Amino acid sequence: MMKMSPTARATPDEHLIAPGKRDMSHTPDATDLHAQVRARRAQLDASTRHALNIPEDSSELWGLALSGGGIRSATFSLGVIRALADTGVLNRFDLLSTVSGGGYIGGMLGRLFTRAHRAEEVAAALAGVDTRWFLWWLRANGRYLVPRGMTDTLFALAIYLRNLLAIHLELGIMALCLGCLLVGLDLGTWWWAQGAATRDPGWITSFGALPAWLPTLWLLLPLGVVAATVIVAAHWALTWVARASLGKVLAHWAGGLLLTLLLLGYQLVAGGVIDDSPARDTRRALWLVMDLLLLGWVLGVPMAAWRLRQVPTEGSAALHVEAARSLLTQRLATCFKWMAAVLLVGLMDRAAWFLAFEVQDWLATGMAAGVAIAVLRAVLPSVSKASASGGAEGAEGLTGMALNLIGYLMVLALITWWWSLLHKVVFGAMFDQQQWSWSPPVLVLAGVALPVLGYLLLTGRNASFLNLSSLHAFYRARLVRTYLGAANARRFPGVNHDEQGALATLPAQGGSAAGLVAVTRVERDDDIDMGQYRPQDRGGPVHLVNVCLNQTQDPRGQIYNLDRKGLPLSVASGGAMRVGTEDWRALPPDNALTLGTWVAISGAAVAPGMGAMTRGGMASLATLIGARLGYWWSPAEGGEAASRFGKLRGLVSELMGSFGGRDAPDWFLSDGGHFENTAAYALLAARARVIVMADCGADPGFEFKDMENLVRKARIDLQAEILFQRKKDASDPVWGQLDAEAWAQFGALDELAAAQSDVCVAVAKVVYDGRSEDPAWLIVVKPNVCNALPVDLRNYKRANPDFPQQSTADQFFSESQWESYHSLGRFLGKHVDLQRVQALSASGGLSPMVDDEESVVGERDVPAPQARDGAAAAPAPAAPPASSLRGTRAAIASTISLSAAATVGVSAWQGMEGWRAAQQATTDAHRVALGELSTMWAKLP
């Protein structure tokens, strides 16, 4: 498309170009954010730029942040967006940053811009009356994200069970592969023992001294003990070896070797003479310890000298020794780790043998394990609810620890069962023979090992299985049809997609189903490649979709990101990406993904990797019960060849909650709220001068935990200090020049939580890099109830006391509920206009706001929750200790993704919705069940 002049309208020739297409020769570099902003501003009418005081360059960035919070966030944010269109400032925003639920409506907004000819058309449609096709679609289909009705539920259940069985089949094959190695070791050890006893009957006595229950693998433990002894001896010998001369070291070492040989000779001679004397076992144990210590010394001295030669020689001698000592300590830890693994695997091997040959009903045990998984998924909400009702933080922590342990135990139990199956078929072939023979078990083992190994080798590169077997595709498809489909004119009858498209008004008689493409059907042009998605080309904002790059390990010592366990990844419309505070770079052209995929990833709240909330046991639990909404993505350019065992590595990473992160070839991505839920982080990183934030995370107690997280990360990562404001005193001279009534709804953060308050919008000053003389401004629009609300919202509040902080698990929005959140967002957002924003940044003491030293997020008493009209506010609960504020954020893990995963888990129960007579009762039951599941996942550490 030819670039229009600021004052020109599209010509008839330009109308021939399909909306969303563009002339690539005039497209600025996607990795140059400021070039994108300049090009965006140039697309606006000159009158728009003049009215909004928009500079021609890329300075004075304005950003709109839409936070996570599921369908509630999407609906409330839609109201805020329409309010900004009402006040005429929507087209002032250069950047649109979204997380999770905010991305639903943000993606729809971006698609409206890509299909429009001018940004002013979109703003006019959003500000107009509710007779546009896209608004009709959202109202009609906003609840489609969650299955409803018998047919829809059975469809979701089929997907869930198919994926769950596929995952367990892969895990079973992996367990069998490991089991083949273990059973092969057992067979080899038994074969060697039989041969040794045949050649020398004395071995029979030695083997008979071993306990019958001893796992074969534990025979390797003495080697580990010897290795650990040698490392310890080397550690204590380091200082002496470093200081002594070479001759002295050799002399002492030779003396130690001679003493060892003499002691061994003495034991052989003396043992034959007094072998039958009392305390024989004690004497042998003492001699064994002495032998071990001397052997450790003999081997430890050379090891100490070798390690001293390995470390760098720079620095003092003491530093040289300290470096060698640190290296030996690491080796000792590795030795202990391997010994622990041998102990654990040996114990599992013994348990597998017990299940195979000592349990009466072996198959019933496996079936019971499957039932246990289903029961565990069903009872987890009740366990979490019980711990939460106790009101004690320790109870929640104990529950989290218990669930983490249960996850590990479930993995071990699953592997053990598959090993017991292998024991049954392999050693059963040996014991079923009338005469002891090695051929049958070897043949059976080979018959299992060859196809298992062949399958792993042939399918190991199929890393796409990881995403296909998760719930991501199900979630993405519904999200695309529900929200991105609202901007697709092809879904609406009689609408020309080359003209107004979804911005067109409905016929006078209202929307008609005739010719309408149902939300259950796939329709072309719903989604778009991220590189082709460019709302900025039509004057819309550059859309930043934020996700979390999970990272629990690091090659630099495995301590980096110890608390966060994740990095922010922002993906910009046009095909650019940014990890943390690094420079922008292009998305890989062959793996840029689509807008719908990125928005779905941004809302993947329940996954084995959940940023700071990642725990190994919980990752195991999520994998085993099929709660997998995360996404594996390769950022490599040029399409590097897939790893031979990419699928295996990814599945093990999910099972153990271990992710390589930034430096790994494949990245595990999840909900952007797992790092930062308000979506303002990316705007602060871009040094935006004005940020309007729709803070919609679940916060029934108005504790502002998402805000606390933003304040802390902005200070640490971005050198941006967020200072909340309050209105100046009524006696301040500034009110002689400003209308106090116009600022009645602006105030301190605490005032948002007050039961009776006129304040409904909070303001913060942002100081970048310590430049307090040139601050930026953050305007927080948070769902709350203030005195000036319209009558219908106050009445809805009376009937629904939890409004507007109802659980994000509630995705069954009724008409009144949808309209209430939408209207609330529109009411609160209308207080943000150009005049107020300009007044905030006025110099010379003319700003109506001043620093509020009492509004320190995370370091003050939690305000009293908002009460119903006519009811007294509940007493404010005691503020949690500072340490607890670093815990799990309830708001982050409770998004629509959770509901999608949880709903399929209770799908049989949801089928009751089909009974028309119980329609309303069933809907209420759905809300209760999903609320409990959401509470459980939200409490996970």
Label the predicted regions:
Residues 2-941:
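Catalytic domains of lipid- and phosphate-ester/thioester hydrolases
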